[in-house]
Each structure stands twice: as structure tokens, then as C-alpha cells.
Amino acid sequence: MRPAADITLGGRYTLTERIAIGGMGEVWKARDKVLGRIVAVKILKEEYTGDPGFLERFRAEARNTALLNHPGVANVFDYGEEDNSAYLVMELVPGSPLSSIIEREGTLPPDRVLNFIAQTARALAAAHSQGLVHRDVKPGNLIITPDDRVKVTDFGIARLANQVPLTATGQV
């Protein structure tokens, strides 16, 4: 299935607009018809759904992120597979990636940067306390809300500290 506006996944999540395109898939804004809320739906690229390794990484992202309950981590609500597609339903975080803010504003004031670092560290500490290692912390994976709260996103290559990694050393 190729994602498009007005497609409904799982009989529940109606896609409304594409928010972003990444290496493993697309993120869409969607309406949850059951709960009446707006969510983000990350859809794995079709070319990867036939690859058991990629599909397992995507499932692992859903499982691993769902373990977390912290205000600095975007919540995962659901996961599904249908019509040769896999998707992850999560909190739609208002705001912009830190990478976009840096592009737009240039050098940020040190106190603001320190605030972002402290919030990110707290969110990662919560992940680490549950044995989850993010492995891809970068400005593009930190969403900054309008009131300067940080939400860590994209645990796509995260792993549980006690598990064998799904990627070989040196691969992303």
C-alpha cells in the first residue's frame, strides 16, 4: 500500500497529510476514528516490508518505545500490519525538529541549548533505566514544542541493552 490522504489503516487511522519522509518510511498526520484524536502514523516504506530484518526493526521500535512512559519521549499508541505495510501510531508532537530550528534561527542562546540538553538527558535516562539505548540521538530526532519542551522521537535503531543488535557493527 502506498500511503495517501484519506486511506484508513487498521479500520481506525485515517491519513490526512504527510508530515515527513525519512530513511525507513513516511510520517503522516492522521485522525483516530475511535478516540477522535489526531495522531502521527509512521509507515514503513513498501520496499522494506518484504525484508524480515527491516520489519523486525520496525516492530522492535514499536515495542521498545511503548515501554517508555516519560514526558520527554513521544508516546507510542499502536502498531499494525496490513496490505503489505507496517505502521506505528504515536503521539503527534506539536513543534519542529531541533535541526529545523537551528537552520531557521542559526546559533541558539547557550541557556536555551542547555535547557534542551538537560531535557534530552532526562528522557534518555528514563530510556536507559528501562534498558533501552536510542543510538540515533541527533537534532532531527528531537522535536521542540512551542513552549520549548523536548520530545525524543525515532527509536528506529534503538535496542534493549541486553539484546543482540539487529544491525551489524558499523551499519545503520
Model-derived regions: residue spans:
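Conserved N-lobe loop of protein kinases adjacent to the ATP-binding glycine-rich P-loop
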Residues: 31-38
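Activation-segment/catalytic-loop signature of the eukaryotic protein kinase fold
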Residues: 79
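AlphaC helix of the eukaryotic protein kinase fold
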Residues: 43-67
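Activation segment signature within eukaryotic-like protein kinase domains
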Residues: 116-117
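Protein kinase catalytic-loop region centered on the HRD/HxD motif
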Residues: 120-132
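Conserved short submotifs of the Hanks-type protein kinase catalytic core
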Residues: 83-97, 101
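Protein kinase glycine-rich loop
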Residues: 15-22, 27
